């Protein structure tokens, strides 16, 4: 989701949320909020649900309830094409699911640490991507935190980061822009574990009626293919759940 040139919110989740609101027969108003304060502002009553690419994680479930997941997009590292980190082959794996505790997954983490030892990895603060680096790569990489994905993408392009870790979709968006022409993915796509169980809407624990309404709309939109069509329109591929 982002602001267009007219200052209006647009994006896959804006279209998704507007469609869900129409099906629920309610009028919804979008509110912008800095990421670091997004859950506290929900709990303070500034808005009634978070629809903002928030991954469903056990840590967040301690504070809020989540709707059924409606989108999922793995996380991946991106580097400059001329970087020594380009085209990393990590344990021969294209995808690493951290919910699996097998030898291949552990080997992949070990090889990733060895490849990126001493490098600066840039991530958005208070995200699952920061959590991954702190849990699995603490001490091996220098973690540089940013308030917004756009900021760390620009620093990657300028050579101030050796790599960034973010959602696949946000990196693709950057690579397709003028500023990201020299950027490429490297290594496998990560999911599970600290990356959670897909993207869902977050509501206050006491708001069970709101949760039920959204879950009904999400199920309907998943069944009839609406969410799939929205994600294909915005991401060029189906990342619906």
What do these predicted ranges mean?
Residues 21-32, 115-117, 135-148, 160:
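A local structural motif
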Residues 1-54, 62:
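Extracytoplasmic small-molecule ligand-binding "clamshell" domains
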Residues 14-15, 29-40, 105-109, 143-158, ...:
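Short helix-initiation/N-cap motifs at beta->coil->alpha
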Residues 26-29, 34-37, 55, 62, ...:
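A conserved helix-loop-strand patch within extracytoplasmic ligand-binding domains
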Residues 37, 53-63, 131-137, 150, ...:
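A ligand-binding cleft/hinge motif common to bilobed small-molecule-binding domains
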Residues 11-24, 81-103, 120, 127, ...:
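Extended ligand-binding regions for polar small-molecule ligands
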Residues 72-76, 168-216, 237-241:
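Periplasmic-binding protein-like
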Residues 1-3, 59, 85-87, 131-132, ...:
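Short, solvent-exposed loop/turn elements at domain surfaces
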């Amino acid at each position: 989701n982002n602001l267009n040139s007219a200052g209006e919110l647009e994006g896959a989740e804006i279209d998704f949320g507007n469609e869900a609101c129409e099906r629920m027969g309610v009028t919804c108003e979008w509110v912008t909020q800095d990421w670091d304060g997004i859950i506290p502002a929900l709990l303070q009553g500034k808005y009634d649900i978070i629809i903002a690419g928030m991954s469903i994680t056990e840590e967040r479930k301690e504070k809020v309830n989540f709707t059924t997941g409606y989108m999922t997009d793995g996380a991946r590292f991106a580097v400059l094409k001329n970087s020594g980190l380009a085209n990393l082959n990590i344990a021969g794996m294209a995808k690493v699911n951290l919910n699996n505790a097998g030898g291949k997954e552990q080997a992949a983490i070990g090889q990733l640490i060895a490849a990126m030892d001493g490098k600066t990895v840039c991530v958005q603060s208070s995200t699952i991507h920061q959590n991954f680096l702190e849990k699995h790569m603490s001490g091996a990489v220098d973690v540089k935190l940013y308030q917004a994905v756009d900021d760390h993408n620009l620093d990657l392009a300028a050579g101030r980061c050796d790599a960034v870790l973010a959602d696949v979709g946000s990196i693709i968006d950057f690579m397709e822009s003028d500023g990201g022409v020299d950027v490429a993915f490297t290594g496998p796509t990560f999911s599970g574990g600290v990356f959670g169980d897909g993207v869902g809407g977050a509501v206050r624990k006491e708001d069970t009626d709101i949760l039920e309404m959204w879950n009904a709309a999400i199920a309907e939109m998943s069944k009839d293919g609406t969410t799939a069509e929205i994600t294909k329109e915005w991401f060029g591929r189906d990342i619906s759940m």
